[in-house]
């Protein structure tokens, strides 16, 4: 039996070698490799700005109420895109209406958007929540507005100053049945009271009103500072000089200085200020695509190289007639500067809450 063992081992070895050769010589199955088709390039942003700038010879005429601004390429004048219009890096939204370009609908390029309204933060006053831009009256003496998380209030009682010098003993008292306090003048009976009376009989004679409002104390507040330090802005005041003797808000356009002129270049050598700047040529006023019917050569307040600021010192209000390319014309009241002076008493005219320091504190407004 010993001779059988070597033959058995040899047979097993031959079988193993045969299996290995069969595996090595058998054909290998082919593996299919999938190559995806090239995708369309959707992340490439189109070029809306071209350099050098190519602008038309004359700026476009914008519809009434649409601002004429410089495009996003800082090249040409365009009519600003309005709410709901498409916008790009060149065709920008109207900044004077608080609009911005929302690119969220153009992912992933973020090239073409839609003009949307800026949504601000609401306010909370005395436990009551108000939305951004909402106006409200916490009491009968104040009218407040919520502006992006901050509450600004203006007084409704138009008696900020005591009577004039003819009143020797003025007193600020509460009148039963009325919200606002009033000045009472305990004058000497021998001294007649000389009030500034507005007799509206002239209005009645012209047919403007049906009833007479005699013994109306005329009141006109000073004009507020211009809403912008350069360029076109708005100034307001309160006046009851009307047929009803009712306090109404009046507004006028104002332009303290041009934004596109470097006034510092006109300051004389050795000087630190230029109080008044006046352009050499007369030009037309423009407003929302409409042009004034005549040319003007206005004076502007200048600038200083130190910490002083220049504000109007002598001014008046003029009426300017505008003519629109399509539609009827209109007229607006405009600030006309005669003289300016420069001092260190400066404040930002855009700070609508600066006057609140002279008003009662928060507790009085909230209560």
Curated annotation (Swiss-Prot):
Disulfide-bond pairs as recorded: 49-73, 53-75, 55-76, 62-79, 87-101, 93-115, 273-310, 290-324, 301-340, 304-342, 309-346
Residue ranges constituting the TSP type-1 domain according to the UniProt record: 215-260
GO annotations of cellular component type: cytoplasm; cytosol; extracellular space
Domain CTCK as annotated: residue spans: 273-347
Domain named VWFC: residues: 121-186
BP term (GO), one: osteoblast differentiation
Compartment(s) of residence: Secreted
SMART domains in the record: CT, IB, TSP1, VWC
Annotated IGFBP N-terminal domain residues: 45-118
Leader sequence residues: 1-22
Glycan attachment points: 86, 143, 284, 343
Tissues and organs where the protein is expressed, per its UniProt entry: Highly expressed in kidney and lung. Lower levels in heart, brain, spleen, liver, skeletal muscle and testis. Expressed in low metastatic melanoma cells.
Keyword terms, alphabetized: Cell adhesion, Disulfide bond, Glycoprotein, Proto-oncogene, Secreted, Signal, Wnt signaling pathway
Similarity-based family: Belongs to the CCN family.
Function: Downstream regulator in the Wnt/Frizzled-signaling pathway. Associated with cell survival. Adheres to skin and melanoma fibroblasts. In vitro binding to skin fibroblasts occurs through the proteoglycans, decorin and biglycan. Suppresses tumor growth in vivo.
Name of the protein in its database record: CCN family member 4
Organism: Mus musculus (Mouse)
């Amino acid at each position: 039996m010993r001779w059988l063992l070597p033959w058995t081992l040899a047979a097993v070895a031959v079988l193993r070698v045969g299996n290995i050769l069969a595996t090595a010589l058998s054909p290998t199955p082919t593996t299919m490799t999938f190559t995806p088709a090239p995708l369309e390039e959707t992340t490439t942003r189109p070029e809306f700005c071209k350099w050098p700038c190519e602008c038309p010879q004359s700026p476009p005429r914008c519809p009434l109420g649409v601002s004429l601004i410089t495009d996003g390429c800082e090249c040409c004048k365009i009519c600003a895109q309005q709410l709901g219009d498409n916008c790009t890096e060149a065709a920008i939204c109207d900044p004077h209406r608080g609009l911005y370009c929302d690119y969220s609908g153009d992912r992933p390029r973020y090239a073409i958007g839609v003009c949307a309204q800026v949504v601000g933060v609401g306010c909370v006053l005395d436990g009551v929540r108000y939305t951004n831009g909402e106006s409200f009256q916490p009491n009968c003496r104040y009218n407040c507005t919520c502006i992006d998380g901050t509450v600004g209030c203006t007084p409704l009682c138009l008696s900020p100053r005591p009577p004039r010098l003819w009143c020797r003993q003025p007193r600020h008292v509460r009148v039963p049945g009325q919200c606002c306090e009033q000045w009472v003048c305990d004058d000497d009976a021998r001294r007649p009271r000389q009030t500034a009376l507005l007799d509206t009989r002239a209005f009645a004679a012209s047919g403007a009103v049906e009833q007479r409002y005699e013994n109306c104390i005329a009141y006109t507040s000073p004009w507020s500072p211009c809403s912008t330090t350069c360029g076109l802005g708005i100034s307001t005041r309160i006046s009851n000089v009307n047929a009803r003797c009712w306090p109404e808000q009046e507004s006028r356009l104002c332009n303290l200085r041009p934004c596109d002129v470097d006034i510092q270049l006109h300051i004389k050598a050795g000087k630190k200020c230029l109080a008044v700047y006046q352009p050499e040529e007369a030009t037309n006023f423009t407003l929302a695509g409409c042009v004034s019917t005549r040319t003007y050569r206005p004076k502007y307040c200048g600038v200083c190289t130190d910490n002083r600021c220049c504000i109007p010192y002598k001014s008046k209000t003029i009426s300017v007639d505008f003519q629109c390319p399509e539609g009827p014309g209109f007229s607006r009241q405009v600030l006309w500067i005669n003289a300016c002076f420069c001092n260190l008493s400066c404040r930002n005219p855009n700070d609508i809450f600066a006057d609140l320091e002279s008003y009662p504190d928060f507790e009085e407004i909230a209560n």
